[in-house]
């Protein structure tokens, strides 16, 4: 079977999970990760010297290093999360009304989603309900394919309606990905479902390592969509 046929088969067996990145939200005018960090540096009045350091990190696609500079300047993790939630909420209120892939995803009935975005666009366009990964502890893994879980979304890195849930700093990434519960729950998802990554560039070296660790620890087939260009 070719890749399209495999994905169609996964969908028919209710084992296909689109994993959505920021690339799907940027066309609507939402800020990129780089823009969020730059705006945060301005908002918290980070010194010009440290801003220069942040820009160098961003030019190297080292986003967590750039975030570290802001936090070391005296901004708390919680302050940064609250600003990000506020900034993203305002950006959504002023976002562009354009054709987008969220509308396409909403057309599929038997599907679950994961996302690393904070913006909750999947909730908006697909009328998806938030489902936290840790909730899998209380259920059998095959139950997640039941119709009761159609159109639920797992926000891996938090969501703007819950600023305290947002994963942005290096410390918060490590706390999430290195916990035994996350590894166990994500492993079950990764080995029982097929992921289709959408809107990812994988430019950030730290994120590359995280996904390489997550996806290649055991053999499993997953897919990623890239722009033709």
Predicted segments with their positions:
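Conserved catalytic-core helix/loop/strand module for nucleotide-ribose chemistry
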Residues: 1-229
């Amino acid at each position: 079977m070719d890749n399209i046929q495999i994905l169609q088969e996964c969908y028919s067996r209710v084992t296909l999970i689109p994993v959505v990145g920021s690339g799907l939200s940027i066309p609507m005018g939402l800020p990129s990760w780089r823009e969020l960090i730059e705006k945060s540096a301005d908002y918290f009045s980070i010194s010009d010297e440290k801003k220069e350091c942040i820009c160098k990190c961003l030019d190297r696609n080292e986003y967590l290093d750039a975030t570290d500079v802001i936090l070391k300047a005296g901004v708390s993790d919680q302050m940064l999360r609250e600003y990000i939630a506020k900034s993203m909420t305002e950006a959504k209120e002023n976002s562009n009304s354009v054709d987008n892939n969220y509308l396409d995803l909403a057309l599929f009935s038997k599907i679950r989603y994961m996302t690393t975005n904070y913006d909750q666009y999947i909730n908006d366009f697909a009328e998806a309900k938030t489902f936290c990964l840790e909730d899998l502890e209380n259920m059998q893994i095959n139950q997640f394919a039941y119709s009761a879980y159609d159109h639920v979304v797992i926000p891996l890195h938090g969501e703007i309606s819950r600023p305290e849930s947002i994963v942005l700093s290096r410390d918060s990434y490590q706390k999430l990905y290195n916990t035994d519960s996350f590894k166990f729950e994500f492993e079950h998802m990764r080995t029982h479902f097929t992921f289709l990554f959408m809107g990812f560039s994988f430019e950030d070296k730290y994120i590359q390592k995280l996904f390489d660790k997550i996806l290649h620890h055991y053999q499993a087939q997953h897919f990623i969509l890239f722009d033709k260009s």
